[in-house]
């Protein structure tokens, strides 16, 4: 069974993989990093005008990294907005995914946090730098193979 967006993407011969539906009936799609930006633009034009959230996670130690986007199609006069979840998997070594900042401005801090915690580089993001950790921090704290330092000196702001 396909959701509306998946059926539309198939009709227009756009590469993706349906991962089924979650417990709330929200369809989840897998998109390749190289196809993500064009499908993001198409999704926006199709009506997914709101990026509800973006997050990232480490799939497994030494495995892929995933960037997850929850998109919502909000229309005037429609009681129940349509939602879709899109997962973009990137290799652990040099993970690069196109930024959707220029489509949905709400991706700004969310993509920066994913970069800061997992090291996913969001290409063409205007301010991709650490947001939670100090600039001098080495490594990506939410990766499953991350080894925390025994000591880290916190510098006073004064």
Swiss-Prot record:
Bilayer topology:
Peripheral membrane protein
- Any Pfam family the entry gives: Complex1_30kDa
Spell out the molecular function terms from Gene Ontology.
NADH dehydrogenase (ubiquinone) activity; quinone binding
* Main location, first listed in the record: plastid
Q: What is its subcellular localisation?
A: Plastid, Chloroplast thylakoid membrane
Domain of life where this protein originates: Eukaryota
- According to the UniProt record, what class of enzyme is this? translocase
What InterPro entries does the record tag this protein with?
NADH_DH_suC (IPR010218), NADH_quin_OxRdtase_su_C/D-like (IPR037232), NADH_UbQ_OxRdtase_30kDa_su (IPR001268), NADH_UbQ_OxRdtase_CS (IPR020396)
UniProt EC number: 7.1.1.-
- GO biological process, alphabetically ordered: photosynthesis, light reaction
Q: Report which reactions are catalysed by this protein.
A: a plastoquinone + NADH + (n+1) H(+)(in) = a plastoquinol + NAD(+) + n H(+)(out); a plastoquinone + NADPH + (n+1) H(+)(in) = a plastoquinol + NADP(+) + n H(+)(out)
Q: Which GO terms describe its cellular component?
A: chloroplast thylakoid membrane
Report the SUPFAM superfamilies cross-referenced here: Nqo5-like (SSF143243)
> Which key words are in the record?
Chloroplast, Membrane, NAD, NADP, Plastid, Plastoquinone, Quinone, Thylakoid, Translocase, Transport
The record's comment on protein family reads: Belongs to the complex I 30 kDa subunit family.
Q: How does it assemble?
A: NDH is composed of at least 16 different subunits, 5 of which are encoded in the nucleus.
Functionally, this protein is described as follows: NDH shuttles electrons from NAD(P)H:plastoquinone, via FMN and iron-sulfur (Fe-S) centers, to quinones in the photosynthetic chain and possibly in a chloroplast respiratory chain. The immediate electron acceptor for the enzyme in this species is believed to be plastoquinone. Couples the redox reaction to proton translocation, and thus conserves the redox energy in a proton gradient.
What protein name does the entry list? NAD(P)H-quinone oxidoreductase subunit J, chloroplastic
Q: Which organism is it from?
A: Drimys granadensis
Q: Report which gene this protein is encoded by.
A: ndhJ
């Amino acid at each position: 069974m396909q959701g509306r967006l998946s059926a539309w993407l198939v009709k227009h011969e756009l590469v993706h993989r349906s991962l089924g539906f979650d417990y709330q009936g929200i369809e989840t799609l897998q998109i390749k990093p190289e196809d993500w930006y064009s499908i993001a633009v198409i999704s926006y034009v199709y009506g997914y005008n709101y990026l509800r959230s973006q997050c990232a996670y480490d799939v497994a130690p030494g495995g892929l990294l995933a960037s997850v986007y929850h998109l919502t199609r909000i229309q005037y006069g429609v009681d129940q907005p349509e939602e879709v979840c899109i997962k973009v998997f990137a290799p652990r070594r040099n993970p690069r995914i196109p930024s959707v900042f220029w489509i949905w401005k709400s991706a700004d801090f969310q993509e920066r946090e994913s970069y800061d915690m997992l090291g996913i580089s969001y290409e063409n993001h205007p301010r991709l730098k650490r947001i939670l950790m100090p600039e001098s921090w080495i490594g990506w704290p939410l990766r499953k193979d991350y080894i925390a330092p025994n000591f880290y000196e916190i510098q006073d702001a004064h």
